[in-house]
Regions:
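Membrane-embedded helix-loop-helix hairpins and adjacent transmembrane boundary segments
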Residues: 2-574
Length: 574
């Protein structure tokens, strides 16, 4: 079966407008994947009778299954397309979002925060806020989270459609509807249980498919040193291959960011906000069978997270070394008919994959997009059903009614996500869109949750007004810069800051606003009595000890191991 290429120019090979045509073996591989996904949904429908079954997979997942699902829920288009694009745009600096922007927060979730989430038996993060602060905080966070999840789901739809357009020449609208219908069917049937099993399957496929690009690309460039040499030749004016060395100035690195923005904005705020309060990922850990499994799951996920740059960031760096002409922002690409940063991964896929391998590679991408869509849609269904519908509209319905509502809400979430897919096209790259959303909703939420867990004096009024002030301040700062670009120097501390740097600093300021308002209001309003804080706050929760367990079975032991590996990697790529 022939592979059709229409030339533009791709370094030693051409960049085509229509990149590849599927051979029969490729179609068979993709069709088998779709059949397996739908089959899992139909099979697991029999095990989703109650609300706990549908929304939390019956709380029966082992640490390994919950841990891999915890990571796979985040290994969708945001990782595959978005961070490959970010690596092309910013170089190895994009790796910060996997290491300092993930590992410490995941370990903190497992060791410090998971006991409160799990012991309180909440269905969601907004559910925890209801128990800790009351109904107003729950509704505010639920509405914000529901809004964010459908916007995030749109990223996956847009990215999958982009791959089908670039790699296969398929119509973008057709691709969106095929993926949407498939996700709606299997999540409606099996709920979170179906989503988790498919996420583990998709995790394996993603690694099998995406790793091919990294291995073959390094062979072509002559290994890591050969790739670095080619990048320096293609981009002599910038340093794209060091993690920390160029972070002492806003102007010495491609991102236009100072190390304080990475350490404080990303490492201390956005990463902790996302990995400890975003219900999309926390929901997977809540499905663990016991507290030890729930604590181990994020730690297992952190171990794998450290390796993800080798299948996500590396293709973007290989694109810097190999692709010509240079890629550009989405708006410029649309205007000129060129290729954007967002297309670096499908371009690399087109460069290396023939029949069979192409089917595996495309299936890996489809798996990643559908994993991200399913994660957001299932989380949206849970938050809507428990934190909005049950809390405000129909409080005393049967369990079966809430399961039915969850299924209908899944369909609604998919339909709304289709509309949001087209919003992504207005941003320079996928990751600029994602990080803007995180700075709006995730950074302030982390301030509220962590104060609520660790400070008994934190009052219901303080939690609500702090969360609201943090969210509105972030949106306000974003609007200020859009209306007056000169304001960037006040938000990001430099007029040279790029979009990603602005997102980091905006997240930091919104978190500070949230914490200050929460503390100030709490000090002048009445806190809850300690009798109402049992299992919700440090000092009021009886957390089972682990002294009777062998060292290798203790979550803390593995957290230390992962933490040491994290430090070593940062030193190696300094």
């Amino acid at each position: 079966m022939s592979i059709h290429l229409i030339a533009l120019s791709l370094g030693d090979a051409p960049i085509p407008t229509r990149l590849l045509a599927l051979a029969p073996v490729d179609m068979i591989i993709i069709a088998l994947y779709f059949a397996m996904v739908l089959g899992i949904g139909f099979y697991l429908k029999r095990y989703t009778k109650t609300g706990d079954d549908f929304f939390l997979a019956g709380r029966e997942m082992t640490a390994w299954v919950a841990g891999l699902s915890f990571l796979a829920a985040n290994l969708g288009a945001l990782e595959l397309m978005g961070w490959a694009a970010a690596a092309y745009q910013y170089g190895i600096l994009a790796t910060h979002w996997y290491w300092i922007g993930a590992i410490p927060a995941m370990l903190f979730l497992g060791i410090v925060m998971m006991p409160f989430y799990y012991i309180s038996k909440t269905h969601s993060v907004p559910g925890y806020l209801k128990l800790r602060f009351g109904e107003p905080s729950r509704v505010l966070s639920a509405v914000s989270f529901g809004f964010m999840t459908v916007l995030m789901s749109g990223i996956n739809m847009y990215s999958m459609a982009l791959v089908m357009k670039v790699v296969l020449g398929w119509d973008i609208n057709f691709s969106i509807w095929v993926s949407s219908i498939t996700v709606a069917v299997y999540v409606c049937l099996g709920g979170l249980l179906s989503a988790i099993f498919n996420e583990v399957l998709q995790f394996v496929l993603i690694w099998m498919g995406a790793l091919l690009i990294s291995i073959i690309g390094l062979i072509e460039t002559g290994g890591w040193s050969g790739m670095v040499a080619r990048i320096h030749t293609n981009f002599p004016g910038g340093d794209y291959t060091h993690l920390w060395r160029t972070m002492g100035s806003f102007t010495d690195n491609p991102m236009g960011i100072h190390w304080t923005g990475i350490v404080l904005g990303l490492g201390a705020v956005i990463s902790f906000g996302y990995w400890t309060t975003d219900f999309l990922v926390v929901q997977r850990v809540l499905a663990a069978k016991d507290l030890r499994a729930a604590k181990l799951a994020p730690i297992i996920g952190a171990g794998f997270k450290m390796m993800v740059p080798f299948i996500v960031i590396l293709p973007g760096l290989l694109g810097l070394a190999l692709l010509q002409p240079k890629l550009m922002g989405e708006a410029q690409a649309v205007a000129t008919g060129g290729h954007s940063y967002n297309e670096v991964l499908p371009l690399m896929l087109a460069r290396y994959c023939g029949p069979g391998l192409l089917g595996l590679g495309v299936t890996a991408l489809i798996a990643g997009f559908m994993s991200g869509m399913a994660g957001n849609v299932s989380a949206f269904a849970t938050v809507w059903t428990y934190d909005i519908y049950k809390a405000l509209i129909r409080k005393d319905a049967t369990d079966a009614h809430y399961v039915s509502m969850g299924r209908w809400c899944t369909i609604l979430g998919v339909l709304v996500s289709i509309g949001t897919a087209y919003l992504v096209m207005q941003f320079l790259s996928i990751m600029d869109y994602v990080q803007a959303l995180f700075s709006f909703f995730i950074a302030p939420l982390f301030g509220t949750v962590v104060l609520g867990m660790l400070w008994k004096r934190c009052s219901p009024a303080g939690g609500f007004w702090g969360l609201l002030a943090g969210t509105l301040s972030s949106i306000g700062m974003w609007a200020w810069v859009k209306l007056d670009p000169a304001a960037l120097k006040y938000i990001a501390l430099s007029s040279n800051a790029r979009d990603m740097a602005e997102n980091m600093y905006r997240a930091l300021w919104s978190w500070i606003v949230c914490v200050l308002v929460t503390v100030a209001v709490s000090l002048v309003t009445k806190p809850k009595p300690e009798s109402e804080l049992i299992n919700l706050v440090y000092g009021c929760t009886d957390i089972p000890g682990e002294g009777h367990l062998p060292m290798h079975q203790r979550p803390m032991f593995w957290a230390v191991v992962v933490g040491l590996c994290f430090v070593v990697l940062n030193v190696i790529f300094w």
